[in-house]
From Swiss-Prot:
Single strand-specific metallo-endoribonuclease involved in late-stage 70S ribosome quality control and in maturation of the 3' terminus of the 16S rRNA. The keyword Metal-binding applies. GO terms for molecular function: metalloendopeptidase activity; RNA endonuclease activity; zinc ion binding. It is an enzyme of class 3 (hydrolase). Belongs to the endoribonuclease YbeY family. It is found in: Cytoplasm. This is Endoribonuclease YbeY. GO terms for cellular component: cytoplasm. Zn(2+) binds at residues 117, 121, 127. GO terms for biological process: rRNA processing.
């Protein structure tokens, strides 16, 4: 795990899961994608701040649980430096806590799910259409199972009639 790093930036001073817990998620995603070196910035922000970011970058004027920004290498930056950095993940812990309560999920399980979701976005996965969503969700389910976490979409699938 020495070659995997999460830079924690906690602007919200909100309690977050242990760094080891989230590093385990990064390790799983990295192993699955044969990545031996990776670095991610994890920004912990308030609901107000994530709402501003959501409005600015996604044109949605509401708080969200996570936003990921895949790293785009600037011209001239050496590959050996650029290849390790995956991007930035912004999480609003208060949104995660509310979702976990509403969905009757353990908070640390939900954190791990959402963090893995964000990491997959940094690797190019998306859910703009049903086919992309199915691929991404299936991978999330598989990775979470390795952590002993149940399928987070079961309740949602029952509600959506999937």
């Amino acid at each position: 795990m020495d070659n995997l790093n999460i830079n924690f930036i906690n602007d919200d001073e909100h309690p977050i899961p242990s760094q080891d817990l989230l590093l385990k998620c990064l390790q799983l995603v990295a192993d699955k994608h044969h990545i031996s070196h990776a670095e991610v910035n994890l920004n912990i922000v308030s609901n107000d701040e994530i709402q501003q970011i959501n409005k600015q970058f996604r044109n949605k004027d509401k708080p969200t649980n996570i936003i990921s920004f895949e790293f785009e290498k600037p011209q001239g930056l050496p590959d050996d430096i650029a290849n390790d950095f995956l991007g930035d993940i912004v999480i609003a812990p208060a949104v995660l806590e509310n979702e976990a309560k509403e969905q009757n999920k353990e908070i640390n399980d939900h954190w791990q799910h959402i963090f893995i979701h964000g990491l997959l976005h940094l690797l190019g996965y998306d859910h703009q259409d049903d086919q992309e969503a199915e691929v991404m969700e299936n991978l999330e389910i598989q990775l979470l199972a390795q952590l002993g976490i149940a399928n987070p979409y079961i309740e949602q699938e029952n509600q959506n009639g999937r």
